[in-house]
Design a protein with these regions (language model features):
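Short, flexible loop segments at boundaries between secondary-structure elements
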Residues: 174-187
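Active-site pocket-lining segments that scaffold enzyme catalytic pockets across diverse folds
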Residues: 1-18
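Thiamine diphosphate
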Residues: 3-5, 34-175
Length: 187
């Protein structure tokens, strides 16, 4: 499955759940913007490795909201501490989706450790995350999107040909803050 296909499924599921959605820096955010821009999406523009932490912080600060974060394997490898913090806090309203293509896709597709030996699902289990799933098909992604914890999605290497995000960082944060300040759809 291509990454943009997985992101399309995630975007549709997040929308149907009324969830806040945090997109990883670079091409994943660009692909998310292209397939399903909405005020409930927060696009990371300059902090590699922190989408998972920002998503977790949102879930803890806004417990009535469902929060989903999309991060890449390279980004999570740069911030493995987020898995232990996620395990420790264990919020029911948070799902971290790790798109694992075995490379740093936004910087030239240099291989990550997951292309060889590192297994992010096993790392999450080792950190104590209560629910960890691995998906490789569209059906598996769809069926696991209502869960909490960590979902590792195996995707192909490659960036979709999508334009840059047409919003400034100020516009992204202002509309996201305005949306997240409203009651969650599930309240």
């Amino acid at each position: 499955m291509k990454r943009i296909e997985a992101i399309s499924i995630i975007a549709r599921e997040a929308d149907s759940q009324g969830a806040l959605l945090v997109g990883n820096i670079g091409y994943p955010s660009r692909e998310l913007f292209a397939v399903g821009d909405r005020a409930s999406n927060f696009y990371m523009l300059g902090s590699m490795g922190l989408a998972s932490s920002i998503g977790l912080g949102l879930a803890l600060a806004l417990p009535k909201w469902r929060v989903i974060a999309i991060d890449g394997d390279g980004a999570v490898l740069m911030n493995l501490g987020t898995l232990a913090t996620l395990a420790d806090q264990d919020p029911d309203n948070y799902l971290l989706v790790i798109l694992d293509n075995g490379c740093y896709g936004s910087t030239g597709s240099q291989p990550t450790c997951t292309s060889r030996r590192a297994d992010l699902a096993k790392l999450a289990v080792g950190a104590g995350v209560s629910e960890v799933k691995v998906a490789a098909t569209a059906g598996e992604v769809r069926s696991d999107m209502a869960k909490k914890g960590v979902l590792v999605v195996k995707v192909e290497i490659g960036n979709a040909d999508v334009p840059v995000i047409e919003l400034s960082s100020e516009e992204i944060i202002e509309r996201f803050m305005a949306r997240s300040a409203q009651p969650s759809p599930s309240s």
